[in-house]
Regions:
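Membrane-proximal C-terminal cap and juxtamembrane stalk of leucine-rich repeat ectodomains
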Residues: 106-142
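Consensus positions within tandem repeat domains that build extended binding/scaffold surfaces
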Residues: 10-13, 33-35, 57-59, 79-81, ...
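C-terminal outer-membrane/trafficking sorting elements
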Residues: 175-176, 184, 205-208, 216-279
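Extracytoplasmic soluble-region selector
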Residues: 142-222
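Structural signature of tandem-repeat unit edges
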Residues: 1-8, 18-30, 40-53, 57, ...
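Short, surface-exposed beta-strand/beta-hairpin micro-motifs centered on an aromatic residue
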Residues: 1, 192-196, 256-258
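Core beta-strand segments of extracellular beta-sandwich domains
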Residues: 36, 105-106, 161-166
Length: 279
């Protein structure tokens, strides 16, 4: 179950879902201890980007947990959090600097038999860190996500297209998806159309198979008059069409098919760039 766009998950929301085997809660910042109570069949878990004080999910009952992904902005994990997860044999950490953990955060079976995957260039740091050094097998992540720009800016109410790639490209067939950590500042579609909503800064995440890479988005006040094209909409042969809410309304659209759209303002996106048009 992918809940990567959900920030707050209510009490007992999924309590007793004994058939739930995969869970991804990348954006969650408020999870009660009761939210996933009784979900003891979970085998794969993608933790939130940041393990904050409001993340109170009880993990001791997830005895079938085999694969764990740790969020990139995690500073610490409480001791004995995974001590009862005796089947946990794959741990993926997105954190370059090892989070603070205790010597019993994980169980002895995990320390002895699991593989710990860490970001490129971080193996030695994990081998020297308290708790992490108990892992007998520490390797680099099988791939990394490379974002085209670490920091971008967009005017409020306007949109830009961001991109990222996986290297090595052959390591996964899954697409890179995008998520905003604060939709009040900027929203993003999963394929990277970012729309400014209010002035400020926000982190958006490129995500693929539990691995993440951040991008900083600065939303600026738009002071000028918006230039909306009303003549020749595009020089491109095909493009995806989005409305101003960032929702994709047409894929592989040709110039001739634009006339089929309802009247309004749209964003035309292709690998070569983007244009805003009025229909």
């Amino acid at each position: 179950m992918e809940l990567n766009n959900v920030a707050n998950i209510g009490e007992y929301a999924f309590s007793g879902c004994s058939g739930l085997k995969s869970l991804s809660i990348l954006k969650a910042n408020n999870v009660d201890a009761s939210t996933f109570n009784g979900c003891d069949a979970i085998e794969t878990l993608v933790l939130p980007y940041e393990w904050g004080v409001d993340f109170k999910m009880t993990l001791s009952g997830t005895t079938q947990l085999r694969t764990l992904y740790i969020g990139e902005n995690t500073a610490s994990i409480p001791d004995k959090t995974f001590v009862n997860n005796k089947n946990l044999f794959e741990v993926y950490s997105n954190v370059t600097t090892p989070p603070s953990i205790g010597t019993a955060t994980f169980g002895s079976e995990t320390y002895s038999y699991a593989t710990l995957y860490v970001p490129q260039g971080s193996v030695d740091a994990y081998k020297a860190a308290t708790g992490w050094s108990k892992f007998e097998d520490i390797q680099e992540l099988p791939f990394q996500i490379v974002v085209k720009d670490k920091k971008v800016s967009v005017d409020r109410t306007k949109s830009i297209l961001v991109s990222a790639s996986v290297t090595p490209a052959s390591s996964t067939s899954s697409p890179v998806k995008w998520y905003s950590l604060n939709d009040e500042i900027a929203t993003t579609t999963t394929d990277g159309v970012v729309t400014g909503m209010a002035e400020g800064g926000v982190t958006i995440l490129a995500y693929c198979d539990g691995i993440t890479a951040p991008m900083k988005v600065i939303v600026k006040k738009f002071d000028g008059v918006e230039d909306v094209m009303a003549d020749d909409p595009t020089e491109l042969s095909e493009f995806d069409v989005y409305n101003l809410q960032g929702i994709r309304v047409r894929t592989n659209c040709t110039k001739e098919q634009l006339s089929e759209l309802s009247h309004g303002i749209y964003i035309l996106v292709s690998p070569q760039g983007r244009k805003k048009v009025i229909i």
